[in-house]
UniProtKB/Swiss-Prot annotation:
Record-level GO cellular component terms: extracellular exosome; heterotrimeric G-protein complex; plasma membrane; synapse
Subunit structure: G proteins are composed of 3 units, alpha, beta and gamma.
Organism: Homo sapiens (Human)
Summary of the function given for this chain in its UniProt record: Guanine nucleotide-binding proteins (G proteins) are involved as a modulator or transducer in various transmembrane signaling systems. The beta and gamma chains are required for the GTPase activity, for replacement of GDP by GTP, and for G protein-effector interaction. Plays a role in the regulation of adenylyl cyclase signaling in certain regions of the brain. Plays a role in the formation or stabilization of a G protein heterotrimer (G(olf) subunit alpha-beta-gamma-7) that is required for adenylyl cyclase activity in the striatum.
Lipid-anchored residues (S-geranylgeranyl cysteine): C65
Protein name, per record: Guanine nucleotide-binding protein G(I)/G(S)/G(O) subunit gamma-7
Amino acid sequence: MSATNNIAQARKLVEQLRIEAGIERIKVSKAASDLMSYCEQHARNDPLLVGVPASENPFKDKKPCIIL
């Protein structure tokens, strides 16, 4: 039974390695430059960089607390 398990695990491993070998890869420097370019192009729409207008912020309290 142990030999059967080992063979099954080896087949799964080989299949996974074949899948990973077929993945198209790019250089890290190319990926980094593409990512920086994307970030620079979309920075004006990023609410973390430009903020959210108070009129559009769904989390802002509509009324102040009466107790305070």
